[in-house]
């Protein structure tokens, strides 16, 4: 009963400005808006340029009444939209769980005194969920790109580790080769160990003996040489004696 009285009273207010012709205010709206399927949207209108008192605001979708906000009785939501329509903020209206069928024109009708009725228009377009579409469309390529990136990173890490180990192994082999060469060179050029005193005497004794034998022969030759000289000198002396 109260619902019917509000509608009748609203119709009476709507006819009032036609007789008075004293409408000076304007309705400011968000104009054309869009929202994603499954989301929510706020329909908002604002009355300006007038000092008239707002007595009631009706929200309608084309020919369907969605909600009424009365200055004295408060909000009343149409039973067919209770699950998806919420009052506010302010004199606005919130649509929830949007579907493609919610696309269309919405009207905010301000009933004022003494100006009468002001009407604002909002066009809502409900779009398919871009998040779901883009997620489904780009999920596989994104996962593929991530997998490829991980493969590249893992390959790079493996290559770096392998090169590092190879360099370390080469350094170790190089150091070992240098050590072996140094040890071999030291063994070749190191002085031989001193022989025992007995062996040294025996080694040096043989040349001495040989030298003694060679000196004996030389001495014998010198002795013979001096004998010849003595013989000759004696011969000369005897020769001088006989001549004298």
Curated annotation (Swiss-Prot):
How the protein is affected by changing residue 231 to A?
No loss of phosphorylation
Tissue/organ expression: Expressed at low levels on peripheral memory and regulatory CD4+ T-cells and NK cells and is up-regulated following activation of these cells (at protein level).
* Topological domains, Cytoplasmic: 163-244
Q: Residues where Phosphotyrosine occurs?
A: 225
Q: Which InterPro entries match?
A: Ig-like_dom (IPR007110), Ig-like_dom_sf (IPR036179), Ig-like_fold (IPR013783), Ig_sub (IPR003599), Ig_V-set (IPR013106), TIGIT (IPR042948)
One GO molecular function term of this record is: signaling receptor activity
Question: Quick one: where's region Homodimerization?
Answer: 32-42
Quote the subcellular location field of this record: Cell membrane
Keyword match Transmembrane? yes
Which intervals of this chain are the motif ITIM motif? 229-234
Q: How does it sit in the membrane?
A: Single-pass type I membrane protein
Task: Provide the residues annotated with a glycan attachment (glycosylation).
Answer: 32, 101
* UniProt domain Ig-like V-type: residue ranges: 22-124
List the GO terms this entry assigns under cellular component, sorted alphabetically.
cell surface; plasma membrane
Signal peptide interval: 1-21
- Keywords of this protein's UniProt record, alphabetized? Cell membrane, Disulfide bond, Glycoprotein, Immunoglobulin domain, Membrane, Phosphoprotein, Signal, Transmembrane, Transmembrane helix
Give GO terms for biological process: negative regulation of interleukin-12 production; negative regulation of natural killer cell mediated cytotoxicity; negative regulation of T cell activation; positive regulation of interleukin-10 production
Which ranges make up the Extracellular topological domains here? 22-141
In terms of Pfam families, this protein maps to:
V-set
| Ranges annotated as spanning the membrane | 142-162
Instruction: State if Lipid metabolism is listed as a keyword.
Output: no
Biological role: Inhibitory receptor that plays a role in the modulation of immune responses. Suppresses T-cell activation by promoting the generation of mature immunoregulatory dendritic cells. Upon binding to its ligands PVR/CD155 or NECTIN2/CD112, which are expressed on antigen-presenting cells, sends inhibitory signals to the T-cell or NK cell. Mechanistically, interaction with ligand leads to phosphorylation of the cytoplasmic tail by Src family tyrosine kinases such as FYN or LCK, allowing subsequent binding to adapter GRB2 and SHIP1/INPP5D. In turn, inhibits PI3K and MAPK signaling cascades.
Record's subunit section: Homodimer in cis; binds with high affinity to PVR, forming a heterotetrameric assembly of two TIGIT and two PVR molecules. Binds with lower affinity to NECTIN2 and NECTIN3. Interacts with GRB2. Interacts with NECTIN4.
Domain observations: Contains 1 copy of a cytoplasmic motif that is referred to as the immunoreceptor tyrosine-based inhibitor motif (ITIM). This motif is involved in modulation of cellular responses. The phosphorylated ITIM motif can bind the SH2 domain of several SH2-containing phosphatases.
The protein in question is named T-cell immunoreceptor with Ig and ITIM domains
Q: Which organism is it from?
A: Homo sapiens
